[in-house]
Structures are given as C-alpha cells and as structure tokens.
C-alpha cells in the first residue's frame, strides 16, 4: 500500500535536547494510523515538522510526495491536509457561525453536508462567542473545522482531549466514516483504548525513536504473554530467543512477552521439559508499557 506520509532519518534538536532521533515513518494511504507516545516522546515535534511549522535538524520527509522542508511544497501540503492541534486555538472574538463561515471560504472542497451534521450532532451554539465555549465545545468546534474541509489527509493531535465519553465515541465514529470516504487519518494520542478501537496501523515513539511500526491486526495476532512452569530452576538466558521482548525467571516459572515466533518459543519450552505452557493475548496498553520499560 502506498504511503501518504514518509520520513527518512528525521531528526529535531532543541539545543542539546534530541527531541526526534532518526524517525522513519510510513503512514499507509487510506489508513487510520495512530501515533502513540508518552508526553515529551517527540510526537508534537514530529507533527510540527510534517506541517512545515518547524524545520528538521536533519533527515527528510514527504507528504503526497512533496517535501516537508520546502516552503512551496509545504503550502501545497497544507492545501490538501487538515491539522487539528492539541491546544485547539481559535479566534476567541468570533462566534461559532462566523469562524465556520470564515474557514469555509478558504477550502473549495468544503463539505457543507458534514458541517450541518456535526453542528447538529455536537450541539454547537452558532451565535455564541468562542471565548464563552467550554473546553469540550472548543474541541468539537475545532474538529468540525478540520473534518469539514474535505481534505485527503487529516493530522490530529490528541483529537478527543477534553471530551466526555459520549462525545469521544461520536468523534471516533466520524473518523471511521471519513476514511470510508477516502481520507487518511494520522492522529497522535495517549488514549490507548481509543487507538485500539479504531486504528488499523500503529506507530509507537519513545524518546524520539520509533519502537513499533505495524498493522494493528499483526500486533494483536503476534504479541503474546507466555508463561512456562518447569520441574527445576531455569535461567532467563535459556529464553533469550528471537521474538522475545522481555523475559523474567522466578525459580521454576518463566514469564515472557513475545512479539513473534510464539510457536517456536513454546516448542523450545517443551524441549526443556516444561510441565505446562500457557499462551495469552496481550493488550495494546501492555505492549506500550513494555516498549517504554525497554527504552529506559
């Protein structure tokens, strides 16, 4: 599948702080691609570089085949991509109706049908000044302004921040519908349950480096907890095998997390005369925590 977003060895330094360290991203066209990481992991710096808001220290990146560090290309990218920032900055002196009308004037592919549906669904008060909106209402308005542009690519930074559970579910379903209409979604989040619900591709970043890049189905199929019980004491070294992300031994019990080769690992345990071997699924949250621990 072709990539809408690609980066090669992308780096961003702020003085001596290396915020992004050699990032190689590939966001498949037509996907809902989640960008997971702790606060300070490099997500926002990456998004800023992709959108031409910050220049890379080194490395390259392309969106729609256009260079992210070229001023003319960056303008073309922003004509075809919508960005909803985490801080949801809006013109506070305008009313809801005024900012919608103002934003609509810049985008020839504006979807008036979606605008009307979201106004009703989000219950946004057209005559209210933006400065008088609650945090949740501001988030809904910012999402409406991004979603209705009719863009090929939507880049969303913490899109559900400040929303209640009902509104979150509404937003997630809208994201799915936009992809069905042909858009690509690239969104950063630390809300892992939401990611697990809708994403079909997941990227994890830790301390500026990519630690996972895989289709969600593959992650769910391949990652497993394995626990084996042996008749005698065993060593962790006996299970330093391909595909083992982490292993711990406590007397006769070995517990490990595997990212692949689970059948081979189970066979190895049986060859070592394991009394029992249990294989269990692992959640995306647990995988994320494993990646963070491994990076410390």
Enumerate the predicted regions with their spans.
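Alpha-helix N-cap/helix-start and coil->helix boundary motif
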Residues: 11, 97, 192, 233, ...
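C-terminal coupling/interaction segments
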Residues: 257-296
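Short, surface-exposed beta-strand/loop "edge" segments at domain boundaries and coil↔beta transitions
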Residues: 151-159, 233-235, 263-266
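Residues that line or immediately flank small-molecule/substrate-binding pockets and catalytic motifs
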Residues: 158, 230, 281
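A broad structural signal for short, well-ordered beta-strand segments within beta-sheet-rich domains
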Residues: 22, 223, 244, 274-276
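Generic structural signal for isolated residues within well-ordered alpha-helices
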Residues: 102, 117, 218, 267-268
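ABC transporter nucleotide-binding domain
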Residues: 170-260
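ABC transporter nucleotide-binding domains
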Residues: 2-7, 12-206, 211-212
